Amino acid sequence: MRRSLSQSPGRVFYGWWIVTIGCVQDAVKGGLFNTGFTLYFLPVLTELNLSRAATSLPFSLSRLEAALGAPFVGYLIDRFDVRVMLVAGTLLAGLGLILLSLTHSYLLFLLVFIGPLSFGFQAGFNQATLAVVAHWFRRKRGLAMAIVQTGQAIGGVVIFPLVALAVLNLGWRMAAVLSGLVVLMLLPLVLLIRGSPESMGLLPDGERSSGAEPYPTAHGLTPARSDAREFTTREALRTPTFWLLAAFHGLRNVPYAGVTVHLVPLLIWKGLDEPAAAFYVGLTALATVVIRPFTGWLGDRQSKQTIGAVGVLLGAAGLVVLAYGDGAWWALVLFAVLFSFGDGVNSVTWALVGDVFGRAHFATIRGWISMFQSFASMPAAVYTGWVYDRTQSYTQALIVFVICYGPAALVLWLIPHPTRPAPLEVAASRALSAS
């Protein structure tokens, strides 16, 4: 019997509601954690009497924690109800921020930062929501992921200035408490997320009908037959494409990790005061709000590899402007726009992972790539701080990051699409026959 998997005419496809929730999540994470923690850098450095390298260490260790945990978290997301991970991660991140405000030693600060705080944001935010979006969209995957990750930039525009006001007027400890309460307010929203369209009797992209029943996969998800040719994690790991994608994401993320933690100190080094530096951080985020959805939309229509390669080269140009510009407003605006291209294509290249390897094991495969990405970028923030401590300048670090962008573009450009294995349903039937 043929079953129609459809939604009522005129109703918004539920996948777009999930994208909206994911965007809100990313806005909170981006404004309070990814971008927001650059505001904590100097106050923590001063209060705990640390060097810049030591202050950078928690950020680098959090990437080590992310590297070690990413494949496991990805497996859990693929294996169990994603809402379990979303709720657990949100609770850990919110409580972690509150606990951070209670630390009065460097050791405790380290333990809280790399423990509940970083793990919560890893497990319950970006990794989980992008996996869900990969299941809900196929033709519009690039745009959907771009909108979700644009939330980080929106957080930089809307939430980051509020964090700046809180840190400057209330102190970093009270800012951390308020941030934790905001994170906990996300709990009702994440409960509305569903793991796949098939779980609600729908199809990816809101397609109106299907000529055949969906089939269950090993992990209880139900991709449509048109999306049936999927890589398992083991099959993906055996392809050169996987390793090239891992190399690209590692190289691309080194400059991002090294620059964003130090962005406010970098801009102060260029001659700005703290309020002006916070303004330009917000401007960088605003540029990403425009650039990321545009590159996502373009990636669904043109080569994702070409768009990603061009984007990281523009990011490299932005770092050259920052390194050798004189701190004039036009140079900082140009840096904000160009560097945003290097970050903005991230959504396109994660969508490429889904295009190449399919939906069923996306979270686990992405987790493995994230592991290598995190290992590669782990030393970046400490290296940036070490360079400044030694030379009283960030120029040497910025040039190294420019060099990282070049091979990243080349690797992405050359990545081949692997030959996909037999469909899962065929493999399953063969295994059944063999037994």
Predicted segments with their positions:
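Cytoplasmic helix-loop-helix junction between adjacent transmembrane helices
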Residues: 114-150, 358
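Helix-to-loop junctions at the C-terminal end of transmembrane segments
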Residues: 69-81, 291-303, 388-389
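C-terminal transmembrane helical hairpin of 12-TM major facilitator-type secondary transporters
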Residues: 256, 276, 282-352
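Helix-loop-helix hairpin linking two adjacent transmembrane segments in secondary transporters
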Residues: 152-200
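Interfacial helix-cap and linker-helix signal at transmembrane-aqueous boundaries
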Residues: 44-45, 76-77, 158, 162-170, ...
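C-terminal ends and interior cores of transmembrane alpha-helices
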Residues: 91-104, 314-326
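Extracytoplasmic gate region of multi-pass secondary transporters
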Residues: 33-41, 234-290
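Hydrophobic core of transmembrane alpha-helices in multi-pass small-molecule transporters
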Residues: 27, 96, 108-124, 250, ...
